[in-house]
Regions:
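Generic beta-strand/beta-sheet core signal
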Residues: 8, 80, 198-200, 235-237, ...
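Terminal RNA-binding accessory module
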Residues: 346-448
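Conserved, mostly hydrophobic/aromatic
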Residues: 160, 180, 197, 234, ...
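Proteins enriched for Cys/Gly/acidic motifs involved in redox and nucleic-acid/cofactor modification
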Residues: 1-205, 245, 256, 260, ...
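Conserved SAM/AdoMet-binding glycine-rich loop
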Residues: 76-79, 86, 91, 189-314
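Glycine-/small-residue-rich active-site loops that bind phosphorylated ligands and cofactors
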Residues: 14, 50-53, 83, 239, ...
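Contiguous mid-protein beta-loop-alpha structural module that forms a pocket-lining wall or clamp
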Residues: 311-318, 325-328
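Radical SAM enzyme [4Fe-4S]-AdoMet core and its adjacent flexible, acidic
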Residues: 12, 206-224, 228, 274-275, ...
Length: 448
């Protein structure tokens, strides 16, 4: 009898890669993947615990999935990921429907958990937080067939005071260049055209392999040699190790997207110090000036935290003025989340939730206006775009949805082509001219 598997992957793209590896292991064991949880014999929930809202979403998703033990075919519920790693005792005690917990380094033990379920036992597998997958692992790609995430490192050594990730993901550890290149070659052979390189701290790639010196530029040089890969994008570029050599290869290598995602979190020096960030405002400004002065335009994305403990109105205003001055192309804003087990979470000068929300909306409003201005400046320009899906438009027309080369999957806006007929299909990369720019999206036409 065929065994069916349902899954939900929450949180970041790094978590999604872990999910895809677990799916690959289970498929090799004879499971078929279904989108209908009601029909699934086994359900896996890969959880996130980065902020409070992510915890709430994870708990609610687990409880919803548990209902399929009564209303569906589910015989086993496996909970994996960061929430499992951090709250294993509480989850096992308070949600008895959970059959197995798998920690962040134990994804390769998913079959051990399944075997325990088949024998009527509950299991909690948390060892090996030093683990990291490699090219030999089976993996079921859940993203569109032409774009895939590649995790080049795991864990983090930065110790930001607001973040629990080092405790639940372990110390920073890199895959070898050979392993990553082999995986990218395999993805290319399956039809992938865009790879998105990810890690907790992508610019630190290789420091554990090369006596404290990053190897990211060396990795990029090897990946650009892989035939079939047309776009290489990087996310989570921590500013400390962002070198001139890295900027140079981004600017000059055609396959590399002219796109830089630098999570700055704040710019006030006192706040940065309290966050245990290594870079000062002056360091940040020097780096951004280099990027802005590059001979080729490089899209700038960042992420910011508002409402960090003790953040004053003046410090928040400094942040707002900085954002207005730099004019990031894209920005993600998060309200500070008080996390158990973190230094910042133990502070007594927490900012009231209503103040954090007000600051969030203020900064998002500022950025929306900047993004709209930036996108309007694109009107009349020509860029490459990747088609992601076709939708039915008005009056029986076909609407193509996709991304410019300057837009990352999942986190940025979209590009739309109206009335494209049968000229394009998902996965196509083609030249387009931007006709209209809005706060997050653009409308374009095909360059014939």
């Amino acid at each position: 009898m065929t065994k069916s598997l349902g899954y939900i992957s929450l949180g970041c793209a790094k978590n999604l890669v872990d999910t895809e590896v677990m799916l690959g292991l289970l498929k090799d064991d004879g499971y078929t993947i279904t989108d209908n949880l009601h029909e699934a014999d086994l359900i896996i929930i890969n959880t996130c615990t980065f902020i409070e809202k992510a915890k709430e979403e994870s708990i609610n998703t687990i409880l919803e999935a548990a209902q399929y033990k009564e209303t569906g075919r589910c015989k086993g519920l496996i909970v994996a990921g960061c929430l499992s790693q951090q709250y294993q005792d509480e989850l096992f005690t308070e949600i008895p429907e959970i059959d197995a917990l798998i920690g962040t380094g134990a994804w390769d033990q998913v079959m051990v958990a399944v075997d325990a379920i088949e024998h009527g036992n509950r299991s909690c597998i948390m060892e090996n937080i030093t683990n990291i997958y490699d090219e030999r692992m089976p993996r079921i790609q859940t993203t569109p067939r032409y774009s895939a995430y590649v995790k080049i490192a795991e864990g983090c050594n930065n110790g930001c005071t607001f973040c629990i990730i080092p405790k639940v993901r372990g110390a920073f550890r890199s895959r070898s260049i050979e392993s990553i290149k082999a995986e990218v070659e395999r993805l290319s052979a399956s039809g992938v055209k865009e790879i998105v390189l990810i890690a907790q701290d992508t610019t630190s790639y290789g420091i554990d392999l090369n006596n404290g010196k990053p190897l990211l530029t060396e990795l990029l040089k090897e990946l650009t040699k892989v035939e079939g890969i047309e776009w290489i994008r990087m996310l989570y570029l921590y500013p400390t190790f962002f070198s001139d050599e890295l900027l140079d290869i981004i600017v000059n290598e055609p396959k590399l997207c002219k796109y830089v995602d630098i999570p700055l979190q704040h710019v006030n020096n006192d706040i940065l110090k309290q966050m245990n960030r290594r870079d000062s405002r002056e360091d940040i400004e020097r780096l951004l000036k280099k990027i802005r002065n590059a001979p080729t335009h490089v899209t700038l994305r960042t992420s910011i935290i508002v409402g960090f403990p003790g953040e004053t109105d003046e410090q928040f205003q400094e942040l707002c003025e900085f954002v207005k001055d730099i004019k990031f192309d894209n920005m993600g804003v998060f309200t500070y989340s008080q996390e158990e087990g973190t230094i910042a979470g133990a502070r007594e000068d927490q900012i009231p939730e209503e103040v954090k929300e007000e600051r969030y909306h203020t900064l998002m409003s500022i950025q929306a206006a900047i993004s709209e201005e930036n996108n309007r400046d694109l009107e009349g320009t020509i860029d490459y775009a990747m088609i992601e899906e076709l939708e039915e438009g008005d009056n029986n027309t076909v609407l193509a949805k996709g991304r410019l080369k300057s837009q990352a999957p999942d986190v940025d806006g979209n590009m739309y082509i109206e009335d494209c007929g049968d000229k394009v299909k998902p996965g196509d990369i083609l030249q387009v001219q931007v006709e209209q720019g809005f706060a997050y999206d653009v409308v374009a036409t095909i360059v014939e």
